[in-house]
């Protein structure tokens, strides 16, 4: 067997070995989503459950559902004037979901709103995600790698301020 054929065979074996891990992770996300959806049947205006399910759908790459639940979170948060909680996290989720769908204007608008709320309230935990999203936007949409790095370092600094060791070490 030639070296290239051996390499291809090795790659196939490795990829097949990863399938159970990917499948298991997907199953965990689906289970977590189902738990939140069941909870929302009883408590449809629970902001924490809406936040969790919207981000779970975002992690699952089901951007339409992330947007659906992110909008609900926004409406409830806005009506309750929960800007530094429900509203900021809805903007983060909506911004990232719209970016992944290619809706760059909406993505930038939501991330910009989240940034304003986060910076005015010194919400470093949320700013980690905001700066990450803005950095991805700068890199992938604007092709402005300097700005992307600036956001990356702002995110690292925000992570340091809120003691997210895993994010800045």
Protein language model annotation of sequence segments:
Residues 1-11:
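Bacterial N-terminal signal peptides that target proteins for export
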Residues 26-169:
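A "functional boundary" signal
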Residues 21-25:
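Sec/Tat signal peptide C-region and signal peptidase I cleavage site
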Residues 10-19:
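Bacterial N-terminal signal peptides
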